[in-house]
Amino acid sequence: FKWRKGTISDLGTVVGGSTPSKSKPEYYTEHGIAWITPKDLSVNKSKFIAHGENDITELGLKNSSASIMPEGTVLFSSRAPIGYIAIAAGEVTTNQGFKSVVPKSEIGTPFVYYFLKNALPTIEGMASGSTFKEVSGSTMKDVPALIPDSETLAKFNEFCGPLFGQQQMLERQNQSLAALRDSLLPKLMS
């Protein structure tokens, strides 16, 4: 097995986020484009996330520097606090409190997810700022990474991929059951 030295940029594309103007209510909606904030991850008890507290509209997306990231993107909060991690369960955008990683297809989401979880102390150590620590996009891209050979990576993804899929399905079922419980419980009490 031959591993090589690299950086997060070798694992995927680092993408920042943006906040559409809060003074423009037409930029926000309930059922629009998923827009995730670190606060959303602070209350997310799952490995996967599909929506946050607010969604944005096409107009909000167009009038900000937010970009849509694909399902499987590993969301990483880069400030306030550093290190909340979740996997996009569908297409999402984020606010500027993220430096997310869109995994290269040959690397895969599971490897990037576990890499970021394990690299958190290193990433925190690279953060800068006097009042609040923050990880910049260029710093995130330069975080050192050991990258396994393609055979090892393929075996890892072959093992983890189905587990991640099953976990995502179970998390969705739990959320559906919780919503059903929450709608039925008041009816039972009345």
Map each language-model feature to its residues.
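DNA target-recognition domains and sequence-specific DNA-contacting regions of bacterial/archaeal
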Residues: R4-P148
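Non-catalytic DNA-recognition/assembly elements of restriction-modification systems
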Residues: F1-T19, D142, L146, S150-S190
